[in-house]
Amino acid sequence: MSPCKVLMVAEKPSLADSLSRLLAPGGQYSTHKNTTPVHEWKGTFRNEPAEFHFTSVTGHVYGLDFTKEYNSWDIDPLKLFEAKTVKSESNPKMRLGHHLQSAAKGMDYLVLWLDCDREGENICFEVIENCLPYMKHPQHGGKMKNVLRAKFSAITKEDVRRAMNNLGVPNENEARAVDARQELDLKVGVAFTRFQTRFFQGKYGDLDSTVISYGPCQTPTLSFCVERHDRIQGFQPEPFWSVAATITKSDVPIKLSWLRERVFDRQIGTMFVNMVTDTKSAGAKVLRINVQKKSKSRPHALNTVEMLKHCSSGLGISPSECMSIAERLYTQGYISYPRTETSKYPENFDLNGVLREQSDHPEWGHFCKDLLTNGYERPSGGTDSGDHPPITPTSLAREGELGGDSWRLYDFIVRTFIGSISPGLKYTTTNVIFGIGNEEFECKGTKVTSPGFSSVMHWITKADEYIPDFKQGEVLPIASVNLTEGKTSPPDYLTEAELIGLMEHNGIGTDASIPTHINNICQRNYVQVSGAGRRLIPTNLGIVLIHGYRMCKKIDPELSLPTMRSDVEQQLNLIASGKAAHGDVLEYFLKMFAKKFAYFTKQIEAMDELFEASFSPLAATGRPLSKCGKCKRYMKYISLKPNRLHCATCDETYSLPLNGHIKLYKELRCPLDDFELVLYSTGSKGTGYPICPCCYNNPPFENFKKGNERH
């Protein structure tokens, strides 16, 4: 009997290679170059001789878009809510669909090794669509009988073998939830973006953004940043006064804090400082000494959100870059799957195995050996979200193997794992209360008695705050008494870490998509990242947009509130769990957003009043460059994104190619429309070619595509 043929598909070529090394006997297999490599070996499958073929895709096989007639920006955006959509290959040049079809010919089984999240489940069905028609059909049962799903959370021999021995079936409900989200985000995002972009870029020249985009997740994300900006701008600092006293013990000065903290009236502050000064000669008497033993609990197991927060605040790595590095470490087999909401180890999780793996590491091996020798209390806290186990190291790596940010992230993940099963941090606080006249002051000291997890998680270390020993009733000399003045200060701008926390709390995006939404508001020039703390400062454009949605009474404020997206995410979860129909959820939200869009377009003038107060009209922006072929007057070149030419006389705007330099081309004119040609080039050594602004925007011949009219 001939061996059965098994086709296996992973999400990335590197993952297919890593999995093949673990599955093939002795890690030996042959590789054939193709669109993506195909690894082959012989073994057994379900107790039968088998021939394995392992290949991959490169993420989504298909992308969702509108049908051809709706791709023009001249279409009424309101029609997009009911427009037909089509899935087309994400990368047509790769011809991944054809590759999968060829690979599936004559196969008996299809085993799907896509990432174990909703996006991965959606890609499973994209792969099935291409492979199933070309496979051998089973003699008994339906066509899907021999389509199997591998569930795994780490690229280790144990995890992969376990997945191979416990193959299940792909989850269509989760895939349909992704379909619903894709269609909703496409239609809502494109409709609002096209309308906003055309309206505002047709009127203002200094917006400095290629598109004025709207996104159901992106806009509430921006709204958090602008809300903090508004609090800062609206903050009114208030002066306050406090009494500061300094005592001495053994000739060492010790500063005391006033228990009243501060008052907001200078005269009252002066009264208190005079009262204390009058009794200065009597000294400061120790009234009470309060000693407390305290502890700081070890952290929960690491999930995606906490990893993103620390990368931004502690390592200075952006959320999108953090996820990119984490995915690479996962694919290389150094860490478990990095997209998870779970912060609790499963009951059967092999904590000892991970500790043993890391026990020979020169940086933290001794911590692991101590825990293995002396034992540890298994963690019980955290949240089990039912998706993937927490993020943990899966193999040992040294700095020389990884280097740079990859090492810094790996170092954090390993240390957090060790810290999560280490004892808590224990310390003692001493609070000494002094009486000076009728006023009370204090000084505080801290002493760490057992560093616990902070020994390995060094960034959490609590420093000792030394104070001398005091006795109750002891009287100490007062060196000085002063009235100090200060002002209340506003909150600071949001950090990326704080924004991630707000997004998680309000249900904006998922652990996988949060980095994308933050990156989008940066790329759109709505916020700028500032300083080592990675604080998000809204630009004028970002501020005006959110103010337009929220503050104009005629505009719908819900467009920028987190509650809208949170409602959408809840319904998508119901689709994923099989409790709601894909079509019903999609129809409900599309109708709702269509009504909001129609209302928004009718009231856009109210929002325009804010833009008018903040930005310059096209006619007042840019510099004269080339002559219009219609009125023969100079058009102004606007270099800010998107770069374009504007004729104030004709009130016409002409788009130009992006990411290059524009200058006048020898004062030559286009023979078709008499517009002066401009030269587009991509740098000092880049290729340059002349363009007619009119032909570039209005192709003169049917077979010419808009944006390709070189002269």
Predicted regions located by residue number:
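Intrinsically disordered, low-complexity regulatory segments
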Residues: 1-192, 479-482, 490
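Basic, low-complexity terminal or inter-domain segments flanking catalytic cores
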Residues: 3-7, 170, 197, 234, ...
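Structured, non-catalytic alpha/beta "coupling" segments that mediate domain-domain communication
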Residues: 33-67, 219-264, 364, 418-466, ...
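Phosphate-interacting basic helix/loop segments used at nucleotide- and nucleic-acid interfaces
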Residues: 85-110, 224-225, 310-311, 411-418, ...
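C-terminal or mid-to-C-terminal helical accessory/interaction module adjacent to the motor/catalytic core
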Residues: 92, 105-106, 154-245, 291-292
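A conserved hydrophobic secondary-structure block that centers on an alpha-helix together
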Residues: 115, 314-318
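Metal- or metallocofactor-binding catalytic centers and their adjacent structured scaffolds
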Residues: 262-301, 471-474
